[in-house]
Amino acid sequence: MCIRDSKKAYVYAIENVVTGLLFGAPHDDFDFIISEENGIPVIMECYPDAFRLSFKGKKCSIYEISDEGFMRGVTSWSPEFVSENEVAVVREIAVNDLYSRLLDEESCGNLIIRRYEDAEDYKSIIAEHIVDRLVRFDAVYTEDKKIKKHYGKIIDALKDIMDGHLL
């Protein structure tokens, strides 16, 4: 069971195995934007080399479970199902090299990886996402070294805007 934004204990599940694999290693909203296009998971790097840094050398397991008792629409992310009850594992699939597996899924057309681009349109999408997350998660004054390293200029600009001098 896991407790997240809802503050309620849920078992979280996703139908698409490849999307599930994207959660096989620790990362957060400051590393990627995860979405879907025509049923195919899409992962956009929020900074250069985020994909490799997050998944290389990582192992994970994904679990096939019964869909009984799962509800859709409880969380803000449409691919996600939740259950308030513990569920039995039907089958475990061990993944010994998550990075290679995800690259294989990309080459088979089952995953779209948008690697970081030094292009204004790409960076604009990422900047909008990061600003939203910094404000939403009250992270403007964070001490997190990774966030400060990649988004220090955005954080400084937000602090400048939020100090009240523009009112």
Residue ranges and their predicted role:
Residues M1-I3:
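Short, small-residue-biased leader/transition segments that mark boundaries at the very start
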Residues G24-L167:
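Conserved NAD+-utilizing ADP-ribose enzyme module
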